[in-house]
Amino acid sequence: PPSQATTGAWRITVPEWCRDQRNQMTGPADDAELVVKMLNSGAPGVMLDLEDSMANAWPNLMRGVANIQAALTGTLTYEDAKRGRTVGISTSQVAIWSRVRGLHLSQAGVIPGEITSASLFDLALLVHPLDAASLKHPFAVYIPKSESAEEARWWADVFKAIAAAKGWPSDFIRCMALVESHPLAYQMEEFLHELRDHIVGLNLGRWDYMASLIHWNLRDPHWVLPDRNTIPHDVPFFQRLRHLLVDICHRRGALAIGGMTALYPSRTDAELNARALATLEKDKRNEAACFMDGAWTGHPDQNAIAVAQFPEPNQLHARLPDVERYPDLRPAPIGVGSITLGGTRAAVRTVIRYRNGVLHGRGASLLDGYMEDLATDRIYRLMIAQRLLHRDHLAIVDGDGHPMVHDDALVARGFDEALTMLVAELPIGRDPGDEDTLHEAARQSRLMIENGFCDPI
């Protein structure tokens, strides 16, 4: 309904230090070498992640927080064993964004017998030792997994309370927020309004958003997701949201940032490298044509190509003509991609390998050329669950084009076959526990699918 948020004349002011965000490079904060390389990559923005690309474990969190604090003060280093030297952060104006864990997660063990908001705990850990005078980069936060404008009000209150406790100006903490849940797509303007003293932009977190779309359409037999890697980046359920996000952000003076291109370049496979960079260029060119102001990447070799697709530091002055104010944001993916047994098999193999990485302390893993984190795991778990729900009238085919029934037996067989192959692929001389960990990864993944776990865990 109309409100001050949607009808008022309010505007957001983007500070000079972050007006150019044509590429934001992202990666887990607990890897000091990766953090230094991202900060030295030349990307105008870097997002240091305590959330989906980092396994949610206490040692990782402590390393990640320490690395972010050292990055903000310009003191972070790592030891380059190959060259026998210490590598630090080059002096630059790169904007550093710290992604804390979302409000869907809690932290135990802080207060005896109680649980604490993981978001609040991460923020408190980060800012407690920080002295504003020692910061080489402004303190800025990436907000994940929000579902409503009410959450934005909570974040605004927290930012102001922290600033008051630290003796900082009330608007000292700046932020961007990810639109990666379907409900938030309907409250983007209200979300910006609640955080207008702090927020500088919104980001389309498209892989988590895809998972959220499956979740919200899980029981709709007319809304079944095709194989993920057959879905084009400009599929209507993404493109309509891109157009709306840009229109709202630019009307209010905020940046609009595009999503991650998951296919990574390779320095050892020329064919994969060429395909990955061509995919990147096409993807970012589409986002630039929608008048987005930048996008995400995760590999240094992607930076120059990503930046080159955006014609100027930002496109805040530009808006697409005739953008619907209330578009259909849930168009069914009909006539898009394909639904195949191969897609289910790829999903099964990926969720096992991803969960195996988590059990080894890795929140993101390079799998078959794609950098996969929790968002991919969610998509594939939900995709398999959705195909099981609609097995009776789902047109799914095998590699020879023959129709299949996507039932529990097919999925169980897929897990057994994938597990056998993954165990066979383990290297000679492996750790004796590696096979057991793979079995545990498969067990956990199957249990999540069977129990319909949809939340980002």
Language model features with spans:
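Conserved alpha/beta-domain cores
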Residues: P2-G8, M25-D30, K37-L39, M47, ...
